[in-house]
């Protein structure tokens, strides 16, 4: 799970130093890569310096951004990444002034950029949260969901909007404006779309209610979420009381058994429900600008209607059907297409799976990864860990989020990034540029590193690179210094300060900011296997191994 505490680093190498050469790297058998947290919070009590993008001169060769590792000479500044000499702008000419400029003051700073018209249109203003709950779960599942939703509501601002949807073989949309929460339902067909869109059951503006104003109604609706057997037991108890009064003359009491349908095989049209919610969110009236986030809770495979999944089976040696090996390859494109639709409409979809049985992560995962959401899986082998669900939901909604991000890593010429892992989408036009739909302070992405043509960080005489070695710095005698620069462009809304009595204050849009975060770091060079092993960073190595294993299992989406 992502970290909850602010971290002070944004680029972490798999070791304290880079391997000297290809031969050394291969002899150790260690992975070589890095993990970046582009939106990580700075150390508590500090802020990143900000400078206007118009005031910063980029390298004319590799387009890297100026940083604290750059060197200066007469009328020129040298790029710390590629060593290129660049024209000295007037802003950089005075040495005393240079030291105070944000881009040279430390290893990390931000460029302030002007949001475009497209940014304003696609980035919603008012936070709106829609909970989609699998109503077919057992008592343990529903108890966890009630606790998780209570935690979610407590993490929201009083002016945020909230809606509640349940799904079994019917979709239930709650009217949270009533004194007693009412549910309006529509059946999920076995195939095709709903007979009645959710908008006709309850318009979007009425389904979404303000958290602070309707807190009691929201709490009552959450408390009403019961498992089928719990609801059947309550109905049976009520029927028993009625039967006792009706049969007083017979002198015997009749106990009403729980209906068979209450304990029958679960049916849940999850895919149809999320699709219907996405359609409902698309009916926002003119002038309303929402930043929607769907919080889904699932107790097992969605097995009814659009997006239904089945347990994966294969033919055994005896010809009988048996469960196949778990796979992360999608069995259907439904959730991938739905995730792309969410991304197009600025909707983030989170999914919490709390299941006693296996689930088809390969099919469900794209809904989250493509929309910028997160997927949490709580398996039966670790049932004691289920208690963390409410806290996990609270943490996820409490973190700051960046949207519409673009991420690039630039490296010095001896090495390069070879693979990227995480919720990243490669740009179709520019190499090594990745799109990040959404991320928070704890989101991390992994990159494999590899040597380029040089195959070593050693600087040999006669190579023609001696002068560059001096400009680029030296890890030790005769070695070139490895450097990485991260550039992360994102949009976010500034957190508005709360005046006294904020619970009753009407909502006001927070200003949209667009920033480009730049961090440049350099590393030592390890010359022996002993230095490589001594400097290992286990958590980074483990992440690189895990994501590499996943990549060999799933289809790239």
Which stretches of residues belong to each language-model region?
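Extended acidic, low-complexity intrinsically disordered regions
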Residues: 1-557
